[in-house]
Amino acid sequence: MKFLDIGLQEDNENLLIVDGLNVAFRYRYAKTPYYTNQYVQTVESLAKSYNCGNIIVLADGGSVYRKNLYPDYKANRKERYKDQTDAEKKDFENFMGEFVNAFKRLKAKGHLVLRQRGLEADDLAAWIVGKRKEFGVNETWLISSDKDWDLLIADDVSRFSTVTRKETTVENWDEHYRFDRDMFLTFKCLAGDVGDNIPGIKGIGPKRAEILIKEYGDLFDIYNACPIDSKYKHIQELNENADRLLLNAELMDLESYSEQAIIESSMDLEDLSSQVREYLNGSS
């Protein structure tokens, strides 16, 4: 059942893709213990705001693909929670219970919800975005505060953060970043991702990453330029750890490796494609 009962244009082919758990955490940080109804209302309100006749909500199930490549992927998160008190554990269980209830409610209302053990929402989003033309989607809005999803930004794909309340689009890209969209992956590979426990090149933060991009180009240009003659310590670190750029690309390049991540999670690609296609082409 398409989401056309709230005054949207008929035959609407726009798509809202929601980073399910990411959006739920706004209620945890706001200390809202019972948020199922608010969650559903927020998702549907955003669909109305962006004139999206289709809603797909995604949940995280870990990442077999990235763990196989790099066993320490997100290992810092386990450290963060290992000393939880019983009360904190109970609070988190309640939070996840509300999230499960919200997922069930969204599914009952006819929206498509997807979760696969061993697969991250990022990969599902990237795969769907990559197939959007094949699925007949006009415009796509990504709902997440995770800037990793900016790797998917295109003329017809934009992101809204429920945390900052800001949009990231092709038109306002320069307001958010000081490099072109096609250099975002290179920037991430150089600087790393602390939140996901992916190290970059030691000594290279955002400013130095931007300088290297301007001087050499993308990550493969930088890799091929190594060893770079320099007295600077961070360049010497780059020379010694240039292979890190290639590993980071495999870990972070959602567009290139989402399908591989899906396969390694044991999710059936044909079944996934059928679910998405049937939902998007379902009767209104």
What are these regions (language model features)?
Residues K2-E139, W149-E167, L246-L247, D253-E270:
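Noncatalytic, basic helical substrate-engagement surface that gates or grips nucleic-acid strands
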Residues D122-K131, R178-K188:
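Short, motif-level signal for alpha-helix interfacial/capping segments enriched in acidic residues
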Residues L142:
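Conserved SAM-binding loop
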Residues D155, D174, K202:
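Conserved, surface-exposed functional patches that form binding/active-site neighborhoods
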Residues E167-Y177:
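Short, charged, surface-exposed secondary-structure boundary motifs
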Residues D180-M183, L190-I263:
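Accessory alpha-helical DNA-binding modules that contact the DNA backbone or grooves
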Residues S273-S284:
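Long, highly charged low-complexity segments enriched in Glu/Asp and Lys/Arg with interspersed Ser/Thr
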